[in-house]
Amino acid sequence: MDKLQAIRGIAFDLDGTLVDSAPGLTSAVDNALYALELPVAGEERVITWIGNGADVLMERALTWARQERATLRAAMGKPSVDDHDIPQDEQLRILRKLFDRYYAEAAEEGSFLFPAVADTLGALHAKGLPLALITNKPTPFVAPLLDALDIAKYFTVVIGGDDVQNKKPHPEPLLLVAEKLSLAPAELLFVGDSRNDIQAAKAAGCCSVGLTYGYNYGEPLALSEPDYLFDQFNELLPALGLPHSETQELKHD
């Protein structure tokens, strides 16, 4: 693993990498849709929409819900569009506001660390490697979630979706982290679970680790060709020359 020998810092994606946030996100999405009298989506579908930030999540949810409702109305012999519908752009604006309200209530209770995350972060931190977090999640939700999961203490730099002009898969947030840590891009390892993460790493010139257990729009992450592909989070430790315990966090915190 020659590329890993040059690593002097590590940055992580959040949703689908460190945290199983699907329950909380699904609750917020479905409550927002229900409030607008639209069909609810369910977790299996919402998982395929995660990864590009809240605006895109809401666009995907609304597009699906309107199509689903049109199909249901057609099956009942009704016009696909209700004359009383508000314009779609206004509906999207309201949906996003509703989502923010519901997610503020559901984020912490509906989010869980994936197996081995806390112990692995602790081991990397103890080695002296600077750790960073890069997420497309709206910035106001990030710090409270990290605090609730007791992992905020591990990160030197945290970049949320509102902290940059261009979110992943653009390289801007990764290059910003490298700058803040005084590292060359090739010295920063980026760990994520989606093609957005791998594309961002490639564009920034960073080494990448892809994790197979996360949210990747229903497609195999191997198709994105990360530098390394792991099935478990704690595989990072032996890859970086650190001890790996088989008993580390075999269940959610």
Swiss-Prot record:
GO BP terms in the entry: carbohydrate metabolic process; DNA repair; glycolate biosynthetic process
Chain sites annotated for binding Mg(2+): 13, 15, 193
Metal-binding in keyword set: yes
One MF annotation (Gene Ontology) recorded for this entry: phosphoglycolate phosphatase activity
Keywords attached to this entry: Carbohydrate metabolism, Chloride, Hydrolase, Magnesium, Metal-binding
GO cellular component, one term: cytosol
Pathway terms, separated by semicolons: Organic acid metabolism; glycolate biosynthesis; glycolate from 2-phosphoglycolate: step 1/1
UniProt keyword Magnesium, yes or no: yes
Pfam families: Hydrolase (PF00702)
UniProt record similarity statement: Belongs to the HAD-like hydrolase superfamily. CbbY/CbbZ/Gph/YieH family.
UniProt-listed HAMAP family: GPH_hydrolase_bact
Reported function: Specifically catalyzes the dephosphorylation of 2-phosphoglycolate. Is involved in the dissimilation of the intracellular 2-phosphoglycolate formed during the DNA repair of 3'-phosphoglycolate ends, a major class of DNA lesions induced by oxidative stress.
Protein name per UniProt: Phosphoglycolate phosphatase
Organism the protein comes from: Klebsiella aerogenes (Enterobacter aerogenes)
